[in-house]
């Protein structure tokens, strides 16, 4: 993936762009990291399988595909961020679920430095590529800029995978 014409955006990702009002904001508790872009969260007392919006990590658990380059590393990285029983803030975008019934969310983690958009961080560190599917594009600019930065600095899959 070649991303041209993008610079790293210093926009605070904890605040959504002014032209995209948030309709649903919740907190959730991490139950499990399934793979690099899929997790299970406890939301309002029930467990939901969640697909992180706007990112795609290499496969590790697909029933018809082999394990892909940097897939296990992506899963491990997400496990270090989203430790079981950690409370996170989540945001829905326009389309709430994917074709597999998974809840589509942006996940935010509180850190000493402030609030981190996990979806963006996975891309920035080189564990995922951006995957923009309309109409869920609220943080598109930040995630694409993160991918450009990861590619430019040859982080993660940009260095180790063809």
Report the location of each language-model feature.
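Hydrophobic core
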Residues: 1-3
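Small beta-barrel nucleic-acid-binding modules, primarily SNase/OB-fold domains
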Residues: 5-162
């Amino acid at each position: 993936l070649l991303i041209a014409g993008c610079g790293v955006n210093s926009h605070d990702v904890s605040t959504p762009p002014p032209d995209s009002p948030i309709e649903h904001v919740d907190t959730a508790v991490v139950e499990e990291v399934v793979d690099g872009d899929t997790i299970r969260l406890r939301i309002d007392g029930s467990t939901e399988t969640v697909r992180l919006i706007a990112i795609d990590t290499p496969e590790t658990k697909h029933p018809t595909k082999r394990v892909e380059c940097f897939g296990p590393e992506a899963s491990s990285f997400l496990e270090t961020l989203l430790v079981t029983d950690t409370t996170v803030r989540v945001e829905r975008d326009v389309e709430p679920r994917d074709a597999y019934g998974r809840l589509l969310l942006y996940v935010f983690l509180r850190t000493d430095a402030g609030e981190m958009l996990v979806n963006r961080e996975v891309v920035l560190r080189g564990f995922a590529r951006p995957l923009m599917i309309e109409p869920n594009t609220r943080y598109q600019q930040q995630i694409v800029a993160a991918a450009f930065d990861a590619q430019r600095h040859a982080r993660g899959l940009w260095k180790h995978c063809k």
